[in-house]
Amino acid sequence: MTATSMSVQEVSDQSVARWRDYVALTKPRISFMVLLTVVAAGFLASTVVSVSALRVFNAVIGTLLVAASGSALNQCVERLLDARMSRTSNRPLPSGRLGLTEVVVFGTITLCVGLVYLWLAISPMVAGIGFATWVMYVWIYTPLKTRTWTNTIVGAVAGAMPVLIGWFATGATIHPWIIGLFSLLFLWQFPHFMAIAWLYREEYEAGGMQMLPVVDRRGFWTAIKAVLSAGLLIPATLLPVVALEGWTQIIYGLVVAALGVFYLYGACLFLRDRSDGVARKLLRISLLHLPLMMLVMVLSAWVCS
């Protein structure tokens, strides 16, 4: 009886561990950010056109499935590189907890289900955006990471594209809100990724990844890239002010400018002092900046709707 109970417990523990490994394949933090951006885009679109909440929900489900596939297959491609870096060596593939074949099957199934779901539940165009995002992330950005430091440009485009799924799923057309939101997601990533890449530059080098701090030993151009991107982010996110009116227009402009200057300040600190401590400060500022910016956009659009 005891042996049987222990066997059942062991099977249960193994099942839970296996489930956690599959969840880890989807990179939950990235998936959560994708969810937020799709919902934010859908809400902003609802202030421009009449939107069914079901369509936004369908966009979230389909996008999460495609994103899960991208994360899993990205780890398939990078499994040998991940094994060289301490921050990634415990992932399911390099640690040997999951096999390559089963992860490829998982990634293929989630991709197909996600694309079919977007096609049938929303439209072929939205499914096409989802597929283009997946291709850009898995088959362009991922291989480029070992070839050129410009990989982050492609990665930033792929990272911003889910907002297009959320927006166009509603039937909305080009509008200052989607231009501003896409610009936010695109430009925000550079200071954020430069801080991360600087902190883990030695591990990236050990893994054979050509991030800018790996080739830019002093970090000058890494910091310049962060400063320029943070600077461009201010006018780009001020664009939606033309869709607002009255006091909302003024308040939006002031708050967005203040948040942008705060982000730029963090990047300038990094330019002046390229230490790990300042890089962490920039990273923390970036993690505060993005959700606050999306919240300001959503609230401003809601007030004027």
Q: Where does each model-flagged region fall?
A:
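Transmembrane alpha-helical segments that form the membrane-embedded catalytic/substrate-channel core
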Residues: 65-72, 135-143, 184-201, 234, ...
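Cytosolic, membrane-interface loops and tails of multi-pass inner-membrane proteins
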Residues: 2-17, 77-98, 191-221
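Intramembrane alpha-helical segments
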Residues: 100-170
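Multi-pass membrane catalytic core of lipid/isoprenoid biosynthesis enzymes
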Residues: 79, 87-127, 217-242
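Membrane-embedded alpha-helical segments that form the functional core of polytopic membrane enzymes
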Residues: 36-44, 48-79, 87, 111, ...
